[in-house]
Every structure is written in C-alpha cells, then in structure tokens.
C-alpha cells in the first residue's frame, strides 16, 4: 500500500502521501516536487499553445486547435464581461491562470499511488504531484496577483489617488481616516489570502479524500469493491471541482484587476 513498498500504518500512509520532497529547513525549505510539477506544467502549457498557434490555419482546424480556440474564446468572453478597463495584458493573464491552475489541479486525477511508487523506484522517498495542494504554490500565485493589483492601482490612480482610496473610503471624512485605512487595508490583504486558501483548501481536501479511499484497497473484498465505486464517483465529481476552482481563481483575478483600473 505504501508508495515505497514498505508496510505502513494507515496514519503513516496518509502522512507519506502528504509529505513533500523538500530541501532546507524552516522558512528556507524548498518543496522540490511542487516546483518541478508547477514549472513543468507551465512549460507544457506554453509549448502546447505556441505549437497550436504556429500551426493554426484558416481552413478546417484539427481537434486540438478547436479545443484551444474554444478555451481562448471562453476566457476572452469572460474578460470582456468582467473587466471594464483597457489593458491588453488581462486576457493573456487570465488565459494563463485558468489553464495553468487547471493543469496543476488535474494532477489530482492521477491515482495517488502511481507517481509516488514510480518515484520510489528511482530512490525518491516522497513525492506530491499536485502543486495546488501545497500552500506555498497557491500563495505564490495569489501574491503575484496581489502585486499586479497594487501596481495597476498606483499606475491608473496615481500614488495620491491610491492613498485617497485607502483613507477616504468608505467614510469620506478626515476624522475617519484611521478607520478607513484599517478597513481598506484588511480588505486589500484579504484578497490574496482568500485566493490562496480557497484553492489550497479545496484541492488539499480532494487529495485527502482520494488517499482515504485508497486505504480501502487491500483490506477485504467488500471494502475494496466499495473503494472502487467511491473512487469513480469522487473522480467524476472532482473533475467539476478542479475546473470550478481554476475558473474562480481566474474570475476573481479579473474582477480585482478591473477594480484596480477604476479611476474614481
């Protein structure tokens, strides 16, 4: 049952699958597996879309080109409906976020023992293949969005406009500046935190459920049969979850950046 080929207790099995391959200690710990899969999937996304773009023709498109065009059109329409400013970066950014996050989420569809077992054959003791079950990855994505929010808020409104937004809303009175600053700062900081924790929480919970279902295998015939049924049912439902979470992350990014472009 263990990915390393050793007999593990149920608690040890769960802990093994939730442990990252890491180097360093404390704050300076690097999760090598999360970095490898997130960067690798990002490169794969760029390669696929670049290849399709170079081979695109005005004639009858192939299946892959149709699929890519459908995604691009869907994201482009989402941006048109939700983003009210003018910025040529937003649509490519939204496309990158949606596809990249979906691809990282989709790694959760691979049976939980396959990749860790393959890694153990190469002498790698731990392997987490779903980058979005690592809070460091989700916070990295969210912080990137947060920095863009700050950048465009200052670029569009100016430093003085940005400061006024933090100090004179929602109560437009000088006496309320401390209260406004506190409320607006909390609201601003809550954006990346909610983005990161929502994605992490949903994918971590989904991964944990797959692991718990996998524990049923090898116990007895009844539980093994039940495990197969549960695995299939959760797999079908989880496809909706991973797609929805990628969509939500993309849409909130678009909305937050649209708010940053509003010049009052």
UniProtKB/Swiss-Prot annotation:
Domain of life: Bacteria
Membrane topology: Multi-pass membrane protein
Molecular function per GO: proton-transporting ATP synthase activity, rotational mechanism
Gene3D superfamilies hit by this protein: ATP synthase, F0 complex, subunit A
Main subcellular localisation: membrane
Annotated Gene Ontology cellular component terms: plasma membrane; proton-transporting ATP synthase complex
Keyword entries, A-Z: ATP synthesis, Cell inner membrane, Cell membrane, CF(0), Hydrogen ion transport, Ion transport, Membrane, Transmembrane, Transmembrane helix, Transport
GO biological process, one term: proton motive force-driven plasma membrane ATP synthesis
Transmembrane segments: 29-49, 90-110, 134-154, 177-197, 208-228, 235-255
Compartment(s): Cell inner membrane
PROSITE patterns registered for this protein in UniProt: ATPASE_A (PS00449)
Coiled-coil regions, chain positions: none
HAMAP family per UniProt: ATP_synth_a_bact
Function: Key component of the proton channel; it plays a direct role in the translocation of protons across the membrane.
Protein family (similarity comment): Belongs to the ATPase A chain family.
Subunit and partners: F-type ATPases have 2 components, CF(1) - the catalytic core - and CF(0) - the membrane proton channel. CF(1) has five subunits: alpha(3), beta(3), gamma(1), delta(1), epsilon(1). CF(0) has three main subunits: a(1), b(2) and c(9-12). The alpha and beta chains form an alternating ring which encloses part of the gamma chain. CF(1) is attached to CF(0) by a central stalk formed by the gamma and epsilon chains, while a peripheral stalk is formed by the delta and b chains.
UniProt-recorded name of the protein: ATP synthase subunit a
Organism, scientific name: Shewanella baltica (strain OS155 / ATCC BAA-1091)
Lineage: Bacteria, Pseudomonadati, Pseudomonadota, Gammaproteobacteria, Alteromonadales
């Amino acid at each position: 049952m263990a990915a390393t080929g050793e007999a593990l207790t149920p608690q040890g099995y769960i802990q093994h699958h939730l442990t990252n391959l890491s180097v360093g200690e404390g704050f300076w710990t690097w999760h090598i597996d999360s970095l490898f899969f997130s960067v690798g999937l990002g490169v794969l996304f760029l390669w696929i879309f670049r290849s399709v773009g170079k081979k695109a023709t005005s004639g009858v498109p192939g299946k892959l080109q149709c699929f890519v065009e459908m995604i691009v059109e869907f994201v482009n329409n989402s941006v048109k409906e939700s983003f009210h400013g003018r910025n040529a970066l937003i649509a490519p950014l939204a496309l990158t976020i949606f596809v990249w996050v979906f691809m990282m989420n989709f790694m959760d569809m691979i049976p939980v023992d396959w990749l860790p077992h393959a890694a153990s054959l190469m002498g790698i003791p731990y392997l987490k293949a779903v980058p979005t079950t690592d809070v460091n990855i989700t916070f990295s994505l969210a912080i990137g969005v947060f920095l863009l929010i700050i950048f465009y808020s200052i670029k569009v409104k100016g430093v003085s406009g940005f400061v006024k937004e933090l100090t004179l809303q929602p109560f437009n009175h000088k006496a309320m500046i401390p209260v406004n600053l506190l409320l607006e700062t909390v609201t601003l900081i809550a954006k990346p935190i909610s983005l990161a924790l929502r994605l992490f929480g949903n994918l971590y919970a989904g991964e944990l459920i797959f692991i718990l279902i996998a524990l049923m295998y090898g116990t007895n015939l009844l539980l093994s049969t039940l495990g197969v049924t549960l695995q299939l049912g959760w797999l079908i439902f989880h496809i909706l979850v991973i797609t929805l979470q990628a969509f939500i992350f993309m849409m909130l990014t678009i909305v937050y950046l649209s708010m940053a472009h509003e010049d009052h």
